């Protein structure tokens, strides 16, 4: 077995770190700018969601998303590729929405909003806030737009790279043409469930919106190595024999090798988001008591992103019908997860985060239903 250690840091700087450095440099000329934040747009769902921020005053808003078409003022900016200045927030912004109420509570006095546009595509917004009224004169606006180009490029490039990695891995999976491999909506549910858990974890885990977005993007790749497992084992409609289970468990190392090859091809092996991707693929079958595979990691050795995906994967397997089992109710599935916590296998915070979001979990289970196609054997 190839040795593989959890990656807790990489040499490249995260987008959050880059934004904080950009803010630090900006303060030399504009000391009144107390907050920079970027929200990204997901076109298929019309969702605008918080992503990265550098906040010197007030409390950062995190885990917030809204339909762009439900915010006419921002929709106008996106459609017309225009920036916007609010010279007096207290006079021009009225409460009533989560974001407006939050903005008024922070004590910011003026703001400047710049759309992120690349290749004529709207990707999101940069929000710049000041502790002074009338901070953003026309000349300052022009300067900030030019300066923001670098951070906008960084965001656009990283999002493009992340989506390219996912698309490449998905293409490999499709080319393999494995009948029933992760059929139906399993991968969509994995992304949604993993994000749900990550968003509801206690603050001490330190997950940023940037981290959560990467977990959302990369959790569907957790079992990518299964494309190297023979169909007779992958699609077996019953319990695996010991020898079959050993072969099934090699999908983890196969997945790591595959993703490392893709990362190397795109020169992304040191990218910050590569850490989360590799940890998910390598460690999503590890249990906290050391009884998992293939590395037998224990406790804190298992990265939080892997613990999240493990809980999401088991929950999804329990709540959906498979050739070898009937579907369980959400309530019974959560009971099973809690029992696995008591056995020392699963992270208590991750299971609690899911249990505390019962309605959202139920919505994911019922909204993304499987077809009648068979799914791969999880090999647990």
What residue ranges belong to the model's regions?
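Histidine- and acidic-residue-rich, metal-dependent catalytic cores
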Residues: 167-380
């Amino acid at each position: 077995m190839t040795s593989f250690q959890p990656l807790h840091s990489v040499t490249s700087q995260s987008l959050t770190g880059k934004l904080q450095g950009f803010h630090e440099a900006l303060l030399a000329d504009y000391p009144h700018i107390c907050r920079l934040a970027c929200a990204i747009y997901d076109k298929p769902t019309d969702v605008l969601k918080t992503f990265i921020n550098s906040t010197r005053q007030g409390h950062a808003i995190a885990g917030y998303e809204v339909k762009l078409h439900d915010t006419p003022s921002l929709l106008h900016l996106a459609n017309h590729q225009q920036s916007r200045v609010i010279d007096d927030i207290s006079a021009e912004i009225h409460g009533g929405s989560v974001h407006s109420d939050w903005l008024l509570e922070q004590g910011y006095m003026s703001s400047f909003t710049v759309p992120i546009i690349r290749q004529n595509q709207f990707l999101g917004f940069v929000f710049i806030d000041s502790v002074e009224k009338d901070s953003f004169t026309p000349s300052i606006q022009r300067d900030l737009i030019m300066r923001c180009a670098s951070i906008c490029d960084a965001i656009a490039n990283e999002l493009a790279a992340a989506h390219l990695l996912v698309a490449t891995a998905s293409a490999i999976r499709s080319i393999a043409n494995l009948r029933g491999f992760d059929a139906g909506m399993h991968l969509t549910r994995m992304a949604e469930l993993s994000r749900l858990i990550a968003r509801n974890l206690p603050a001490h885990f330190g997950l940023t919106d940037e981290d959560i977005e990467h977990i959302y993007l990369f959790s569907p790749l957790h079992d990518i190595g299964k494309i190297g497992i023979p169909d007779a084992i992958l699609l077996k409609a019953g319990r695996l024999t010991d020898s079959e289970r050993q072969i099934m468990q090699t999908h983890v190392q196969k997945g790591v090798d595959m993703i490392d090859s893709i990362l190397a091809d795109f020169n992304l092996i040191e990218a910050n988001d590569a850490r989360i991707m590799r940890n998910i693929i390598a460690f999503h079958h590890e249990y906290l008591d050391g009884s998992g595979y293939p590395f037998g990691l224990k406790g804190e050795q298992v990265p939080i992103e892997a613990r999240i995906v493990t809980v999401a994967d088991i929950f999804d397997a329990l709540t959906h019908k498979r050739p070898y089992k009937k579907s369980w109710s959400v309530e019974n599935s959560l009971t099973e997860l809690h029992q696995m916590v008591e056995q020392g296998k699963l992270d208590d915070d991750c299971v609690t985060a899911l249990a505390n979001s019962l309605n959202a979990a139920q919505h994911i289970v019922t909204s993304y239903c499987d077809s009648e196609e068979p799914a791969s054997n999880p090999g647990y």
